């Protein structure tokens, strides 16, 4: 417990909040180029082939990004928009690719939660 005099001299040190998406450097999104598109397996209780991409961002960082939704058109050299947001069962994946922006097409035949997957409103008949 510091004395009042010690607090006057030094003061309290503010606890610095660590960024959960440091590669974005405080920006909401960053543009990048796919270096490698591949699948990986999730952590223990789950089983699947999760679609991920290694992306070189415009600021020089290289990060692993999750590709959400069913099916995608991404390949090497695709230009993508990356946002923060981790995937709980994929260690080291702290970013997601935004569907429907730049080279990443929206999810086909998506009826619900369309805005999250970059899908246009279906035609009414």
Curated annotation (Swiss-Prot):
<feature type="region of interest" description="Disordered">
    <location>
        <begin position="104"/>
        <end position="125"/>
    </location>
</feature>
<keyword id="KW-0820">tRNA-binding</keyword>
<keyword id="KW-0699">rRNA-binding</keyword>
<protein>
    <recommendedName>
        <fullName>Small ribosomal subunit protein uS12</fullName>
    </recommendedName>
</protein>
<dbReference type="Pfam" id="PF00164">
    <property type="entry name" value="Ribosom_S12_S23"/>
</dbReference>
<dbReference type="GO" id="GO:0006412">
    <property type="term" value="P:translation"/>
</dbReference>
<feature type="region of interest" description="Disordered">
    <location>
        <begin position="1"/>
        <end position="28"/>
    </location>
</feature>
<keyword id="KW-0687">Ribonucleoprotein</keyword>
<keyword id="KW-0689">Ribosomal protein</keyword>
<comment type="similarity">
    <text>Belongs to the universal ribosomal protein uS12 family.</text>
</comment>
<dbReference type="GO" id="GO:0000049">
    <property type="term" value="F:tRNA binding"/>
</dbReference>
<keyword id="KW-0488">Methylation</keyword>
<feature type="modified residue" description="3-methylthioaspartic acid">
    <location>
        <position position="89"/>
    </location>
</feature>
<feature type="compositionally biased region" description="Basic residues">
    <location>
        <begin position="9"/>
        <end position="20"/>
    </location>
</feature>
<dbReference type="InterPro" id="IPR012340">
    <property type="entry name" value="NA-bd_OB-fold"/>
</dbReference>
<dbReference type="GO" id="GO:0019843">
    <property type="term" value="F:rRNA binding"/>
</dbReference>
<dbReference type="GO" id="GO:0015935">
    <property type="term" value="C:small ribosomal subunit"/>
</dbReference>
<dbReference type="GO" id="GO:0003735">
    <property type="term" value="F:structural constituent of ribosome"/>
</dbReference>
<keyword id="KW-0694">RNA-binding</keyword>
<comment type="function">
    <text>With S4 and S5 plays an important role in translational accuracy.</text>
</comment>
<dbReference type="InterPro" id="IPR006032">
    <property type="entry name" value="Ribosomal_uS12"/>
</dbReference>
<comment type="function">
    <text>Interacts with and stabilizes bases of the 16S rRNA that are involved in tRNA selection in the A site and with the mRNA backbone. Located at the interface of the 30S and 50S subunits, it traverses the body of the 30S subunit contacting proteins on the other side and probably holding the rRNA structure together. The combined cluster of proteins S8, S12 and S17 appears to hold together the shoulder and platform of the 30S subunit.</text>
</comment>
<dbReference type="InterPro" id="IPR005679">
    <property type="entry name" value="Ribosomal_uS12_bac"/>
</dbReference>
<comment type="subunit">
    <text>Part of the 30S ribosomal subunit. Contacts proteins S8 and S17. May interact with IF1 in the 30S initiation complex.</text>
</comment>
<feature type="compositionally biased region" description="Basic residues">
    <location>
        <begin position="113"/>
        <end position="125"/>
    </location>
</feature>
């Amino acid at each position: 417990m510091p004395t009042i005099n010690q607090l006057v001299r030094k003061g309290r040190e503010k606890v610095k909040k660590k960024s959960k998406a440091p590669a974005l450097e405080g920006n909401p999104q960053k543009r990048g180029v796919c270096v490698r598109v591949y699948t990986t397996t999730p952590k223990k209780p789950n089983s699947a082939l999760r679609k991920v991409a290694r992306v070189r961002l415009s600021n020089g960082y290289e990060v692993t990004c999750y590709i959400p939704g069913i099916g995608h058109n991404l390949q090497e050299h695709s230009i993508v928009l990356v946002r923060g947001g981790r995937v709980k069962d994929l260690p080291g994946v702290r970013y997601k690719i935004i569907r429907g922006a730049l080279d990443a097409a929206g999810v086909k035949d998506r009826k619900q939660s369309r805005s999250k997957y970059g899908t246009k409103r279906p035609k009414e008949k």
